[in-house]
């Protein structure tokens, strides 16, 4: 009849959509490899479902309806929600191979001349030069002094002195295959039937893992005085962790992982109310 509806499952983990021929719609948590045991009187809050509707006479699109709702009720009210900044990010041009202090600062000068408002340091600032950036996540305390001899705060101060904002990239959940963190702290790793995932990651359903992630983010923001942080996630968590020594159930590891991730983001937002947090997943 020309009327339109939009549904979105407000959830970062696995989900399930079923639309019948009769027009009935079922939306929710995937049933595959998911179980959640509740104790007597224990409650479980399920993820939200976003629904937008407009009739054929309306000129505004469904996306416009959704954007207005998110802007009014969901997105934090800070400088980024009012007007996005023009950003320079070193990725794709230099990636992790060619970026270093001299290259970054030279581009900051160009960005300043062009009126760009935000300069972001992407992957490649941690670990050692010989190992690929995707194999060292987790070693966030090990700043690559070969590439950045004066440290990250020096870069941030250089950017701030020119009236621009400083941003930095982080993939906090990822656990690089060759990282020192993975070698020294195996208790935090997400496992499936006792085996590591092809792309290892930290299970946030484990309290130690969650505390570590919060510390990674807050320490990096404080030490660099960052205005903007880009949180990436370049892996598939698949069905999550089913370890029985993590504090979550055997069938709800991924569910608890994302519940805790949202709690961490809320805590970071409370601590740094003006921090701009960008959600990124392999660039998307």
Where are these regions (language model features)?
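Feature activates predominantly on carbohydrate-active enzymes
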Residues: 4, 11-15, 22-24, 29, ...
């Amino acid at each position: 009849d020309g009327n339109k509806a939009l549904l979105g499952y407000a959830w970062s983990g696995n989900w399930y959509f079923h639309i019948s021929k009769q027009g009935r719609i079922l939306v929710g948590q995937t049933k595959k490899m998911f179980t959640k045991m509740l104790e007597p009187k224990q409650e479980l809050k399920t993820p939200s479902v976003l629904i937008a509707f407009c009739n054929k006479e309306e000129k505004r699109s469904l996306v416009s309806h959704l954007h207005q709702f998110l802007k009014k009720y969901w997105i934090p009210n800070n400088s980024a929600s009012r007007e996005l900044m023009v950003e320079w990010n070193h990725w794709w041009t230099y990636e992790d191979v060619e970026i270093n202090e001299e290259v970054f600062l030279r581009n900051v000068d160009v960005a300043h001349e062009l009126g760009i408002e935000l300069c972001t340091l992407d992957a490649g600032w941690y670990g050692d030069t010989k190992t690929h950036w995707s194999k060292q996540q987790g070693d966030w305390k090990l700043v690559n002094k070969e590439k950045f001899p004066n440290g990250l705060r020096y870069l941030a101060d250089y950017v701030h002195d020119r009236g621009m904002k400083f941003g930095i990239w982080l993939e906090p959940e990822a656990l690089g295959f060759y990282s020192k963190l993975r070698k020294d702290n195996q208790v935090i790793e997400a496992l499936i039937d006792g085996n590591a995932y092809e792309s290892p990651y930290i299970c946030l359903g484990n309290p130690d893992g969650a505390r570590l992630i919060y510390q990674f983010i807050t320490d990096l923001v404080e030490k660099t005085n960052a205005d903007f942080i880009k949180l990436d996630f370049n892996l598939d968590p698949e069905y999550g962790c089913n370890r029985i020594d993590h504090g979550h159930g055997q069938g709800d590891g991924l569910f608890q992982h994302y519940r805790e991730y949202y709690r961490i983001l809320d805590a970071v937002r409370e601590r740094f109310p003006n921090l701009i947090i960008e959600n990124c997943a392999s660039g998307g």
